[in-house]
UniProtKB/Swiss-Prot annotation:
Protein name, UniProt field: Uncharacterized ABC transporter ATP-binding protein YcjV
Residues the record lists as binding ATP: G37, P38, S39, G40, C41, G42, K43, S44
Source organism per UniProt: Escherichia coli O6:H1 (strain CFT073 / ATCC 700928 / UPEC)
Residues of the ABC transporter domain: 4-235
Cited CDD domains: ABC_MalK_N (cd03301)
Classification lineage: Bacteria, Pseudomonadati, Pseudomonadota, Gammaproteobacteria, Enterobacterales
Gene Ontology BP annotations: carbohydrate transport
Family statement drawn from the similarity comment of this UniProt entry: Belongs to the ABC transporter superfamily.
Cellular compartments per GO CC: ATP-binding cassette (ABC) transporter complex, substrate-binding subunit-containing
């Protein structure tokens, strides 16, 4: 079990490329933290600095109050699972899982106990005598997880462990890793570019862009209260819709739209002196409904109707704006069809058009 403190962490390479910039985060014991962001945002580099595989250029890394900057990787009490399984093909599942413990010269009885315990948790007992070539991708990933589990480390680090699996296996392994966290009751830090993995697995999500932390929070918080337009657009699938316009009286207006703003949001916009200035309204696809209400109704034309089974994703054109609408599958929708959509303005978000920071 472990607490981590990352204080003003920096990573600067010899060519002066600044990959991680002033990273600050307190991680409590037993948390499941997910670093998420696009490729090149610095999430894997940060993980590797925690593991001791990358040198920290500036700042301090503390584990249970002890400064770890100069402590070698093998002495940090950390276990890591990589994107590639990195299994020894000539060894059995048992020997792959036991290899690290044998290198530490741990007693055979202890090794046997730990390997069998991990295999039981991961559903690998019947595969212990097989070699990796006889396993599926999901089973190989479980072996890689098992190899980390048997170390009984204080912190588990996972660097995009599911990216090599097909879609169905990823969903299955996502749930298995969440269950594993509950069983082990230990601190886990997980890196992914997949916001769905972040939303479904994390205690808290750390969203990064260009080496800078954009927001830290529980999944529901970052989804419902994004700190800026990047977070709002990155978290959620399909992404949040954005419309540029201005505030005129109690209306959000563009050249073709006029939508009434709820009083609570309008009061915040007034205190932030956002009236008559360029502003961006954001609204999620599920907060635009294909049925008319008393106000905030707009005519839209469907360009693409995607049926996912339980619902439709409607790609529509609304007064020159491209908007995605999430609709139930009770009705049929077709490309070229004209529909009336309703904006639930109680759920909309407003961002400063210049800074892209959330206003309300």
């Amino acid at each position: 079990m472990a607490q981590l403190s990352l204080q003003h962490i920096q990573k600067i390479y010899d060519n002066q490329v600044h990959v991680v910039k002033d990273f600050n985060l307190e991680i409590a014991d037993k948390e499941f933290i997910v670093f998420v962001g696009p490729s090149g945002c610095g999430k894997s580099t940060t993980l590797r600095m925690i593991a001791g595989l990358e040198e920290i250029s500036g700042g301090d890394l503390l584990i249970d109050g002890k400064r770890m900057n100069d402590v070698p990787a093998k002495a940090r009490n950390i276990a890591m699972v990589f994107q590639n399984y990195a299994l020894y093909p000539h060894m059995t599942v048992y020997d792959n899982m036991a290899f690290g413990l044998k290198m530490q010269k741990i007693a055979r009885e202890v090794i046997d106990e730990r390997v069998n315990w991990a295999a039981q948790i991961l559903g690998l007992r019947e595969y212990l005598k097989r070699k990796p070539g006889a396993l599926s991708g999901g089973q190989r990933q479980r072996v890689a997880l098992g190899r980390a589990i048997v170390r009984e480390a204080g912190v588990f680090l996972m660097d995009e462990p599911l990216s090599n699996l097909d879609a169905k296996l990823r969903v299955q392994m996502r749930a298995e890793i969440s269950k594993l966290h509950q069983k082990l009751n230990t601190t886990m830090i997980y890196v992914t570019h997949d916001q769905t993995e972040a939303m479904t697995m994390a205690t808290r999500i750390v969203i990064m862009k260009d080496g800078i932390v954009q927001q830290v929070g529980a999944p529901k918080t970052v989804y419902n209260q994004p700190a800026n337009m990047f977070v709002a657009g990155f978290i959620g699938s399909p992404a949040m819709n954005f419309i540029r316009g201005t505030i005129d009286g109690n209306k959000f207006v563009t050249e073709t739209l006029k939508l009434t703003i709820p009083e609570e949001k309008l009061a915040v916009l007034k205190t932030q002196e956002s009236l008559h200035k360029p502003i961006v309204m954001g609204i999620r696809p599920e907060d635009i409904h294909p049925d008319a209400q008393e106000e905030n109704n707009i005519s839209a034309k469907i360009s693409v109707a995607e049926l996912t089974g339980a619902e439709f994703m409607l790609y529509t054109t609304v007064g020159g704006h491209e908007l995605v609408v999430r609709a139930g599958a009770l009705n049929d929708y077709h490309a070229g069809e004209n529909i009336t959509i309703h904006f639930d303005m109680t759920k909309c978000h407003f961002f400063d058009a210049e800074t892209e920071i959330a206003i309300c």
